[in-house]
């Protein structure tokens, strides 16, 4: 990765699966929060830093409020937050000279998003993945835009949540369509 990316002069943004191997679900989140996977994330941190990617923007457990991901926080948001926190601390400790940027990144969707927040001291950026898609229930563009703005975890929520913590915002994944 470093050999391919470093010559571009651009900063790399990586989504990091928050569970490893065959681990998934609430039990895996608790195991991660207890440190079982620390060595995995420490190795990733060293590889990135040693490869000249110590300024990477990292998105551990992206879109954690989506049910389909093995690291979904829907059932245990506090275990997710503890695991995410531990991952960020382990990676920073493993590569102390790196300047990783940790982007906490829900999806515009449902779920206990705020309850899965790991803390201001480990989150550098508050991201939101948002897609302007015309699902059958949002064919009208104005209604669709209101949904994006006013959804429980929508654009207004994102703005207010980040501002309350003094954090910059990002949109790591976004798109528009019909």
Residues of each region from the PLM?
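Active-site beta-loop-alpha junctions enriched in small/polar residues
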Residues: 17-19, 61-63, 103-107, 131-133, ...
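Acidic/histidine-rich catalytic cores of soluble enzymes
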Residues: 102-112, 116-134
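Alpha-helical scaffolding within the catalytic cores
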Residues: 2-3, 39-46, 106-118, 149-161
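Short, surface-exposed loop/turn motifs that are enriched in glycine and acidic residues
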Residues: 77, 116, 144-148
């Amino acid at each position: 990765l470093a050999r391919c990316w470093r010559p571009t002069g651009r900063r790399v943004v990586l989504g990091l699966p928050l569970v490893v191997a065959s681990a998934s679900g609430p039990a895996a989140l608790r195991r991660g929060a207890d440190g079982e996977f620390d060595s995995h994330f420490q190795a990733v941190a060293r590889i990135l830093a040693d490869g000249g990617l110590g300024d990477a923007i990292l998105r551990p457990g992206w879109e954690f409020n989506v049910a389909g991901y093995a690291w979904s926080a829907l059932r245990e948001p506090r275990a997710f937050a503890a695991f995410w926190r531990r991952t960020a601390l382990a990676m920073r400790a493993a590569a102390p000279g790196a300047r990783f940027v940790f982007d906490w990144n829900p999806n515009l969707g449902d779920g206990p998003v705020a309850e899965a927040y790991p803390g201001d001291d480990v989150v550098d950026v508050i991201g939101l993945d948002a897609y302007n898609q015309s699902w059958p229930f949002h064919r009208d563009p104005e209604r669709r835009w209101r949904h994006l703005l006013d959804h429980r975890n929508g654009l207004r929520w994102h703005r207010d949540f980040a501002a309350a913590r003094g954090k910059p915002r990002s949109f790591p994944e976004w798109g528009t369509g019909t």
